[in-house]
């Protein structure tokens, strides 16, 4: 077990972030936890509308407001089962909280910890200035097979596009792009009949954490090797609209 400091960056009070923090703390003694405040909903929607347009964003909001809460309610026991299977806990862990990890103040505080490795676990995009301030490896657990399923909900999109062989999880280095860093490891995920949009990410996270624990000693020691991605295709994904989700569920059975 390395005694070096591993800094984990995540979003405050986010379940997946806490799962990563708890999992790594139990296995590596030198973990430090840094949290970022959630982006305001207004800023998020304004940015999304500029990129995707009003109609698409309206459909995504409807999906998040109507379908996701229902899926979460119906899937609560399955999520608990997945967490237990992979040994994931989401108990609160205290840490430093910043409004933005890209601020100079946050960068200075993280540098003061002298990290041997930084693990990204659900933050906003780290900008070029942040990345240039650190010589240590910065790696990310991504819920999808990159570079084809960059962005969000890679497992769902792989199944929706009838490419189950590319439903999986990636550990990659973080660069200035969105999930475009060099691949360190990838593993396929095979959801079962009880799984859906809400449970896919938890399965991906569980497998991703197992990969991460195996990789971290080599990453810190500078022995980690770059892997060829399962496909060179590249595309950035966002949330489905409510009509996309309903159509794929009814026609193709993708939940």
Positions of the model-derived regions?
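One-carbon transfer enzymes
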Residues: 1-255
């Amino acid at each position: 077990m390395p005694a070096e400091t591993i800094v984990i960056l995540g979003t405050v009070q986010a379940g997946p972030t806490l799962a990563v923090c708890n999992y790594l703390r139990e296995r590596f003694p030198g973990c430090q936890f840094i949290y970022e405040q959630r982006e305001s909903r207004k800023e998020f929607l304004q940015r999304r509308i500029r990129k995707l347009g009003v109609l698409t964003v309206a459909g995504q909001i409807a999906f998040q407001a109507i379908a996701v809460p229902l899926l979460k309610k119906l899937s609560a026991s399955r999520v608990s089962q997945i967490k237990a299977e992979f040994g994931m806990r989401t108990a609160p862990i205290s840490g430093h909280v910043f409004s933005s990890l890209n601020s100079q103040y946050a960068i200075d505080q993280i540098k003061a910890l002298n990290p041997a490795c930084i693990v990204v676990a659900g933050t906003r995009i780290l900008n070029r200035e942040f990345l240039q301030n650190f010589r240590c490896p910065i790696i990310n657990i991504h819920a999808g097979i990159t570079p084809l399923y960059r962005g969000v909900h890679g497992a769902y999109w792989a199944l929706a596009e009838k490419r189950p062989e590319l439903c999986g999880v990636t550990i990659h280095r973080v660069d200035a792009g969105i999930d475009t860093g060099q691949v360190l490891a990838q593993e396929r995920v095979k959801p079962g009949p009880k799984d859906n949009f809400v449970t896919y990410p938890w399965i991906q996270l569980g497998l991703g954490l197992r990969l991460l624990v195996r990789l971290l000693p080599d990453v810190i020691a500078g022995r980690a090797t770059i892997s060829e991605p399962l496909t060179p295709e590249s595309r950035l994904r966002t949330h489905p609209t409510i009509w996309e989700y309903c159509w794929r569920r009814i026609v193709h059975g993708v939940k």
